[in-house]
Amino acid sequence: GLVLLSPQADLTESGDSFQVNQLVDVILPGSLMRNNQLYAADAELSHPYLSPLFGDLTGFPPSFLQSGTRDLFLSNTVRMHRALRQAGVPADLHVFEAMPHGGFMGNTPEDRDLAGEVSRFARACWEGE
């Protein structure tokens, strides 16, 4: 299985959460476009190797995706979940209320809940469920 915790699946930042959540995500400083361009060098940001959201997801393993309502990458996560489902990939989406990018640093009931959900998903994958 594949576990995607607040994934950066679209380096073009085309999802609306890059605008809507800029002032509420306490972990990420806003647009990461300069970093994305540096990382991509001369490649197109929408190339599937850089932004898997735009690629062929057929054959991906069962996937677990997580984000929070205050995460800059919320749109990435929701759109990636839909793209996986459209490609016929079993995928679960978990969105946590008020959670910023990366969660609450491991010290909250939400973080413990997330850890439990990831463990259950991994166990199910290992057991072939």
Question: Can you annotate each of these PLM segments?
Answer:
Residues G1-E129:
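Alpha/beta-hydrolase superfamily serine-hydrolase fold, recognizing
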